[in-house]
Each structure stands twice: as structure tokens, then as C-alpha cells.
UniProtKB/Swiss-Prot annotation:
Its EC number is 2.1.1.33. The gene is trmB. The keyword Transferase applies. InterPro entries: SAM-dependent_MTases_sf, tRNA_(Gua-N-7)_MeTrfase_Trmb, tRNA_methyltr_TrmB_bact. Pathway: tRNA modification; N(7)-methylguanine-tRNA biosynthesis. Belongs to the class I-like SAM-binding methyltransferase superfamily. TrmB family. This is tRNA (guanine-N(7)-)-methyltransferase. CDD domains: AdoMet_MTases.
Amino acid sequence: MSDVTTAEFNEEGKYLRKIRSFVLREGRLTKGQAQAIEAHWPTMGLDYTPEAIDLVKIFGREADTVLEIGFGMGGSLVEMAAAAPELNYIGIEVHKPGVGACLGVAGEAKVTNLRVYHHDAMEVLEHSIADGSLSRVQLFFPDPWHKKRHHKRRIVQAEFAELIRRKLKLGGVFHMATDWENYSEHMLEVMNLAPGYKNQSPTGTVVERPDHRPLTKFEARGHRLGHGVWDIMFERIS
């Protein structure tokens, strides 16, 4: 049994920490995912500790570090890491099958610049990531909680924006992407009010998908069906 914090927010965007217990059910893993964790966790896995990690020690070098929150099955994260070997990548995912899938793909791709957490992202950010240490934070296709009464559960809220700002270097970028237009409007509303940020869009709205974010199969299918995807990038300026 593991205690993991999950995020919830009140109407003002105030972060409410709640402790939830859940069982990591090994049976949910495919054989390949379980084997990938066994094979690659010793070199790519990061066990949660409440102290700030030493990035130079973990990666064996000094380099700009990109952190992705909720990488799903990890395919695009591995693709990014493989395409930019000069950068360090950290992924956080709470669902163990996704961690196993990511490690499997990373092992096949032989990437050496990727580390992953199997833990709650809020707790990792609060305690394990030093302030001013990240060049980019990525939040791609988070749960939109599309019902209005559930909007308070959306991860992009005022306190979350401030937490990300603290973890970014000056000039670092918070990059969000969503396929829900209403959530993109919510993201822009929160980020435009967040101090210390500047929207990288020349129009003050969304940006074109940057080259560093791969086009997923799901997204490509959505484009063919006429569905939109909105990328939002804010730079830390103070």
C-alpha cells in the first residue's frame, strides 16, 4: 500500500492536498511492461524522496532539464528525448502500466537522457525538484474535467502556475497542450493572471505546435476529423 497525494483545488484555485491510498496492482501490467520495469528501473527510475534531487549526479552531466507531467504511455516523451540528446528529460506518471510502457520503449531506443518517476506529480514538484532548476515543464493533454462542476479538479490553477514558475529557470517555459478548447481558454485565463510569466504567442493566445512536441497518432486522427489542438507556452520572466 502506498500513500500518494492527488491534487484538488477550491473555487479560487487554492491547492487542497488530499492523501489517498491506492494499491499498486501488479496484475494490471502486461508481461512486457513488468519486464521493462525490472530491466530498466535501476538505470532510469527515480524513487521519490522529499529532498531535492541533484540533477548533475542523476544524469552525470550539466544540461538543461525538461520535465513532463503525466506522460501517459511515454511514447512521445521517449521520442523527444531521443531527438534532443543534449537535454535531460524527467517524466512523472502515476499509472504503473504507463511507466512500464515508457521504460520498454526507452530501452529499445537506447536513450540515456531520460529518468522517470512513478509518483504523484504535485508531491515530486513540491519536494524533489529544486527551485529554478528546469528549462521547460510540459503538460500535454491533462484531464479536461469537462463538466463545469469538476473544473476545480483541473490541474492548471493559480497555485499550480506559481509552483511551476518557481521550478523554472528565468527564461524557462511552461508548455501546455489540450484538445479541449474550453480548457485552453481556462489555461489562458489562469496564466494571463499569473505573475512572472509572459505569453510566447505574438497574438497573446495560442501558438503553433512547436517542433519539439511530436504529433501523436491520436492527434493526427483528430486533425483528420477536424478536431483542434491548442498549444500554450508561457515564459518565466521574473
